[in-house]
Amino acid sequence: MDVFLPEVGFLALLLSLGVNVLTPLTAFAGVRLRWPAMMRLTCIGILAQFALLLLAFGVLTYCFLISDFSVIYVAQHSYSLLSWELKLAAVWGGHEGSLLLWVLLLSAWSALFAWHYRQQTDPLFPLTLAVLSLMLAALLLFVVLWSDPFVRIFPPAIEGRDLNPMLQHPGLIFHPPLLYLGYGGLMVAASVALASLLRGEFDGACARICWRWALPGWSALTAGIILGSWWAYCELGWGGWWFWDPVENASLLPWLSATALLHSLSLTRQREIFRHWSLLLAIVTLMLSLLGTLIVRSGILVSVHAFALDNVRAVPLFSLFALISLASLALYGWRARDGGPVVRFSGLSREMLILATLLLFCAVLLIVLVGTLYPMIYGLLGWGRLSVGAPYFNRATLPFGLLMLVVIVLATFVSGKRVQLPALVAHAGVLLFAAGIVVSSVSRQEISLNLQPGQQVTLAGYTFRFERLDLQAKGNYTSEKAIVALFDHQQRIGELMPERRFYEARRQQMMEPSIRWNGIHDWYAVMGEKTGADRYAFRLYVQSGVRWIWGGGLLMIARAQVVDTWQFANPQQQQQALNIASQLRCPQCQNQNLLESNAPVAVSMRHQVYSMVAEGKNEVEIIGWMTERYGDFVRYNPPLTGQTLVLWALPVVLLLLMALILWRVRAKR
């Protein structure tokens, strides 16, 4: 059976492609004909294509685990002596496997969306699935035609070429899946926005759904970027955590637009303002997620992460990016309506601060985008070769970063009557992140020198003593490991063990840094080439605060896990808001008020009530506004009007009738 497994995997890819081509047809037909059965068939199609992709990915993973070197992709990226963890990481260690992983995770997001809303009849949901299915079909077409991971080689290779040594690190087991998980969640949010355009309206309820899927996608992308930064710090031996590499920037760009999107959606879902901001940022996030794939997979930009330049793949990748981007922008231009109510902002209102945040994020995004692509544009224009590195990005983005910190402080302390715990957690993470950057940059000290066993050097008050060199042989490599003792005022506080590894299969040498840390300080050692008899080159670093950078990132992610509460400085206002919310009905629920329901529209309306209470509006004004917008149905207590006179008069009439009956009975006696 194992003989035909790769063919089974490829067949599953073909079937999934076919399902994704047919699924949008059922969605559009169901919406147009208002046929619920066709809409449910759309959900079934999404679940079926996910099952097929899961089968294909499972087959590829099994081929790696059993070292099936008859598959070219396995032979190029695996080795029989690799541990099973590294064999698993090798599945997405090359172009074909990583692209299949991305498609699988996007498919998983789509299946989760389909399952979650399988009972809904609103056209928004099948239209969202149709948009997702179209993107999956386009990506699968590229996989089948230009990136098939199941291509055979005959006769089979005797041994594999091994996984790239740079990728043989725990961080790389989780870094790519988290990035692709983030891209997938953000693409679902963008698909909701595009589906709302197809439906004809992007309102607060749509924004709430969009926000609900963008937030976990943003969290996964943030975690992936943090993990990638940690990998670069631990693996590349430069003592830094961010190098403004084109592929690093490729993941930063959608993160910037997604962060701006979340801020914009926070107002759209509550007050239905900034609609165009939210729609455009959702589309831009989709485009930048695709652009990142184009940069990494085509090799058009020089990077330590990118794959080799491949014109055969670059052209269809660019065509795919252009097709989806232009179609999304064209849909926005065709279907976008007015931007909602006209609202005037005061000088330091929440709305004005969020607008400033959006402008700052867009400015940084534009700087990073132009700086990343400019060397390629420079070369295409025939002007020669140009390098745009860290000095440019640091100087160009610094003033905008400082302004962001000012806005965060203002948003935290000048927001007035309401304070949201998730925002406080996220902004605390940003401040800790900024503190880590400043402290690590100011405190960093380094030295490069040659040492023999027994020699020592003092740096930043700490003594590094090269004690001995150990030789080791492990699975797929041999290594020379230096034992460097670390002293603080003559007291031994630990050891550093930098290595030089040689990977036989690839005939490649790698330097493995060694790091010791205590929460505040980092001690970092890299062993270089042999420069004489028992003499080796070393680079040593001491710096503080670098862990705060990743801690700040984790706090930002924790923001997504905090219960979305709303606290008021005035307890009376909080009680008033809860009282009003309890009097309003969720329009889509079975007899639940806004406090009892967690439906997207109910949460959006609840936040609207809280916002209006915080602005000083009274109960009559808020209930009147809700009634005008949603109709009398939204009120648990129907208003006293001519149409409801019978309803309200009935209890009074019955009481009078009962009193009359009792009086007559008593009179007869």
What are these regions (language model features)?
Residues 491-530, 572-624:
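Extracytoplasmic/lumenal ectodomains and periplasmic regions of secretory and membrane proteins
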Residues 610-668:
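Thiol/selenol-based redox catalytic cores and closely related redox-interacting motifs
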Residues 2-561:
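Solvent-exposed, non-transmembrane regions of integral membrane proteins
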Residues 561-577:
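Short N-terminal segments immediately surrounding and downstream of signal-peptide cleavage
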Residues 461, 538, 586, 622, ...:
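Residue-level signature of catalytic and energy-coupling elements of molecular machines
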